[in-house]
Amino acid sequence: MSPGILGKKIGMTQIFRPDGQVVPVTLLKAGPCMVVQRKTPSTDGYDAVQLGLVEFIKPQRINKPTAGRLKKAGVEGAKFMREFTLGPGSDDLKTGDQVLVDQFKPKDKVDVVGISKGKGFAGVVKRHHFRGGEGSHGSMFHRAPGSIGASSFPSRVVPGMRMGGHLGNAQVTVRNLEVIDVDTEDNVLVVKGAVPGPNGGYVLVRRSKR
């Protein structure tokens, strides 16, 4: 059994439970995936599996090393590939195997990893939730970051200083989302809550460990 699966975010909607409760859900196009490479402790030093999301991609868009790996695994095209570390009980996976969404069941807990929407350059108030200064009464300090370091010592800006910069477009993990439904015919996974990224963005779905 694979520890996870790759897919795309379709979008959000809502469903109604039998008691009338409204549940916000996200639809994920999960799989089908193929095992592109199987790593073992004897050959690679650790136990892992590389999955590729099967989808059409122009041959000229694939570099030669990747094309060789895909041909060896019998995969026609895979634009999105990720690696999963394997634990006990996953020895049955081998190169060329298919991974489908039917490995998940309703009420399972999953973690979803995606790339958040990019929002361009943002200041410290929007990016780091700084309070800012007074809005009036002669104040000339409104949304400025303020001091970013001392003077003679250490005479530099320390690493990790919260400043303005690119907001979003970063990897985000949402943990312990409940699986509401699984559509094995259309390879659709329905999870409760929101998932990072735009509609059509690639996501990685794995079983929760917490």
UniProtKB/Swiss-Prot annotation:
Pfam families: Ribosomal_L3
GO terms assigned for molecular function: rRNA binding; structural constituent of ribosome
InterPro entries in the cross-refs: Ribosomal_uL3, Ribosomal_uL3_bac/org-type, Ribosomal_uL3_CS, Transl_B-barrel_sf
Keywords carried by this UniProt record: Ribonucleoprotein, Ribosomal protein, RNA-binding, rRNA-binding
Gene Ontology cellular-component terms listed: cytosolic large ribosomal subunit
GO biological process, one term: translation
Xref: HAMAP family: Ribosomal_uL3_B
Subunit structure: Part of the 50S ribosomal subunit. Forms a cluster with proteins L14 and L19.
Sequence similarity: Belongs to the universal ribosomal protein uL3 family.
Role description: One of the primary rRNA binding proteins, it binds directly near the 3'-end of the 23S rRNA, where it nucleates assembly of the 50S subunit.
Name of this chain's protein: Large ribosomal subunit protein uL3
Organism: Solibacter usitatus (strain Ellin6076)
Name of the encoding gene: rplC
